């Protein structure tokens, strides 16, 4: 008897669209050889992927590649949310890349192809139902970024950042695969739901030293991916050395992918009593170290990089509560899951808006510069600076950045419901620390520039490329909409 079900092509439509985009970009670059056409195909393909994912996710949950009740592909509302966010992020990053690509320092075809490949990994990741699919999708998301970070010609900083990112990612991937192999050795299964059921039904498996080692190694490997402290050292140097649009993608799509993978294994596969304390400790270390080090940063991208480390801590906090909430109500566990996903989506929108603001305020192809380069930017570019400032106060969790405020409130409420009041207090204290550097950058935008300041990049008026302005406007509007109607994300995250 054939126990393998037929393939559901509708469920796989988002993956088809994403992978097809990568192929079409290659063909367009080869046959048409016009950068504008190549970028247009990549952007339209990403938009098509977002639309297709939304349409498939709007219906009932679809499963395929199943053996019995265990499926390797599960596409529902949450998977659709991740796929749509990753696809739209790709469109935004392509738009931010236009000024840098016009300088000719990066090949357009390869650049767009690598972004499309990374998008494919992100789309598959949200629907992964087993460890192999999960890890392959995560690496498909990450591998193209090694090249994108170092693709800028003649830049030693980019080459060093790419090498650092590659070495650290190899270690992370090795640990993740080792953890998966050890779990397979213990349970004989790879499907996430099956792993969770086996460990729950057989307490003797959970108590094995090999199971503890497998959980620890797997968590460490995924912690590298999200730049959680103490596995974070690669992130600031990599972000600062990468081109601005690539740094934006790294701090959003790449981090979202790692968090989705971590959330999937914590919620569905790993024993909660082992993961809870570890994730809670990682969350405290990550948000505290990220905020404290960000206070001392003078370079814009490094500050955003350290702030993204801190933001990862806020997202990890509900995962600790999710594990600690085991044995409590299903509602508490669902709230923790929804809080983590919702915060990640809010963060991604605000972080992309922040990077769009930096790109709009800097000369084409330039790096993020220093905070001094941004002084007085609002006097020269009031609307761009206002959008950038809105993103910063949103990341800080202050009005009028209501999206960030609701994100933090959602996390704190989930922690309280999960019985982790002490962790909620740590989140609140760190949010106060974060106010210092977010408001410092925001204030610098409106501060007068010293009369003796040299006229370096950012000191004079910078003409904005139209598509960068569009990305900045769209992300700002999205942040405002999510702030006014956060339930749009919370409902999907809770499904």
Give the role of each language-model region.
Residues 1-495:
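Alpha-helical transmembrane segments of multi-pass membrane proteins predominantly involved
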